[in-house]
């Protein structure tokens, strides 16, 4: 399982959030890989050629992991999950590379970036919103759903009721329903916080770890 962290984090963010993750992974026989995606939003940036994080996550990282660890090198045994920016990245990566991943989970994911054009350095990767609306449209998760049909991916989406990303997650949920794509959609009390994400791993562990079990 690939675990993508949020904006401003680092490769140790998941371990700091949930120190029990290694034990949970051992109990389930899962390899949990936590890359550092900088503040890339896990795109191959059209503005910054040095930021090719979609390629890194979906190709280079997978090949390295399969080549150096005792994995099952099959999409059915591979999941990707993330929180916040990483939730966007997990869904973006899995939907666009369903040949690589069989499951994806998002916690508090920024699944539609367009309502937030001034935030989280996204303009460094896509250009300023006003002058690059087509690029922003093309780089948001909710506009990728034509790439999958029901059964392509196991999907779980989790977002707190006080989270500023709640409405875009509800929109994603409704779009998936309209396309008759099966998925789990979970909302609970809580915001865009470490406490919520820590509890999510216990309440809905499939969104992070056990989806691939």
Q: Which stretches of residues belong to each language-model region?
A:
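Non-catalytic cap/lid and distal C-terminal segments of serine-dependent acyl enzymes
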Residues: 1-213
């Amino acid at each position: 399982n690939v675990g993508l962290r949020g904006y401003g984090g680092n490769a140790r963010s998941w371990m700091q959030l949930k120190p029990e993750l290694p034990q949970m992974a051992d109990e389930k026989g899962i390899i949990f890989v936590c890359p550092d995606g900088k503040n890339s939003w896990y795109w191959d940036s059209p503005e910054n050629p040095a930021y090719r994080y979609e390629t890194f996550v979906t190709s280079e990282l997978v090949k390295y992991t399969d080549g150096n660890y005792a994995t099952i090198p099959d999409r059915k045994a591979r999941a990707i999950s993330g929180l916040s920016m990483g939730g966007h990245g997990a869904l973006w990566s899995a939907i666009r590379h369903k040949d690589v991943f069989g499951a994806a989970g998002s916690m508090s994911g920024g699944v539609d970036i367009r309502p937030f054009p001034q935030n989280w350095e996204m303009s460094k990767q896509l250009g300023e919103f006003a002058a690059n609306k087509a690029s922003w449209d093309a780089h948001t998760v909710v506009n990728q759903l034509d790439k999958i049909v029901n059964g392509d991916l196991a999907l779980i989406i989790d977002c707190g009721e006080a989270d500023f990303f709640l409405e875009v997650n509800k929109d994603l949920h409704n779009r998936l329903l309209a396309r008759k794509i099966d998925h789990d959609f979970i909302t609970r009390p809580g915001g865009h916080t470490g406490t919520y994400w820590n509890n999510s791993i216990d309440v809905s562990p499939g969104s992070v770890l056990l989806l691939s079990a």
